[in-house]
């Protein structure tokens, strides 16, 4: 793992948290945390555990589409490894690499095959997440409510320049076949392409993975809602707020902080505040959400240290 990247992410997390606690006194947040409901917190922990397990089921389906029939519970266990790395490191990308590397050693399999399966799993799950996002917006609009969100004004020339730069980089990579000059990357690209073809020939499994991705996103997005329910003492417009939770969950996965620390709290403070959530409640709920992630990550770490079950 790049130490410079970790250092930068740590700095960003500190900056974001400092900004949050500059606006919301720490003492107020602590008072809210002391009165958190154990019941709703238990629900949040259970939902997170279910989400991780369903992610393992999803990955197992992708592996089976590639004719890799591995022991089901070992795939689930490796997925818990992945959650541990996702939380402790810098998001799903790093977590998938470490998870696949360890599992490849345990199962004596080619790393490129497991990485390809992991990324194909993410791709199809992303489709499920998009479907979920569309359904949330449609449901919210059908209730007659308006999305309370203010988009920052951005110079269109900046957007155009960014698109052109990205297009230029992609063109250069394609034109000069830069990826093909790195043996491992070329092999990984070819393996991924073959994995996509195999999955295309298994539409039933593909639809299952997409459906599980949608369900997983629903569960993942609900965790902050459960932790908010554990600390709030007021009635909230939950239906109007439906779209907020997946947005915050998505922002927390961006690789600009350590485990989403700071980003989740800042986003919760701003977005939940639009719906009358007390500032201290919003920050406390996001911190409890972080605690749920780390508690389940600790379970993944325990499974990692225990290692592969002996036959």
Predicted regions and their residues:
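Membrane-interface alpha-helices at helix entry/exit sites of multi-pass transporters
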Residues: 73-77, 95-96, 107-121, 277-288
């Amino acid at each position: 793992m790049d130490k410079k990247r970790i250092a930068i992410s740590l700095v960003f997390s500190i900056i974001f948290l400092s900004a949050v606690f500059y606006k919301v006194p720490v003492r107020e947040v602590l008072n809210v945390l002391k009165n958190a409901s154990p019941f709703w917190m238990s629900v949040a922990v259970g939902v997170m555990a279910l989400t991780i397990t369903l992610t393992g089921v999803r990955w197992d389906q992708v592996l089976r589409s590639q004719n890799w029939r591995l022991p089901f519970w070992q795939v689930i266990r490796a997925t818990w490894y992945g959650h541990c790395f996702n939380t402790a490191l810098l998001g799903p990308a790093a977590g998938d690499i470490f998870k696949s590397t360890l599992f490849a050693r345990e199962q004596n399999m080619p790393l490129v095959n497991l990485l390809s399966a992991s990324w194909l799993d993410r791709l199809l799950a992303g489709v499920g997440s998009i479907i979920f996002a569309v359904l949330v917006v449609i449901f919210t609009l059908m209730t007659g409510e308006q999305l309370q969100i203010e988009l920052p004004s951005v110079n269109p020339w900046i957007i155009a320049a960014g698109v052109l730069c990205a297009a230029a980089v992609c063109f250069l990579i394609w034109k000069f076949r830069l990826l093909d000059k790195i043996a491992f990357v070329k092999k990984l690209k070819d393996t991924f392409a073959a994995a996509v073809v195999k999955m295309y020939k298994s539409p039933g499994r593909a639809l299952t993975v997409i459906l599980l991705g949608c369900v997983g996103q629903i569960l993942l997005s609900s965790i902050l809602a459960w932790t908010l329910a554990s600390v709030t003492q007021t009635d909230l417009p939950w239906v109007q707020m439906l779209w907020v939770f997946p947005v915050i969950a998505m922002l927390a996965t961006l690789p600009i902080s350590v485990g989403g620390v700071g980003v989740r709290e800042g986003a919760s403070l701003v977005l939940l505040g639009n719906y009358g959530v007390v500032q201290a409640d919003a920050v406390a709920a996001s911190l409890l959400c972080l605690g749920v992630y780390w508690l389940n990550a600790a379970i993944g770490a325990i499974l990692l240290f225990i290692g592969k079950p002996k036959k």
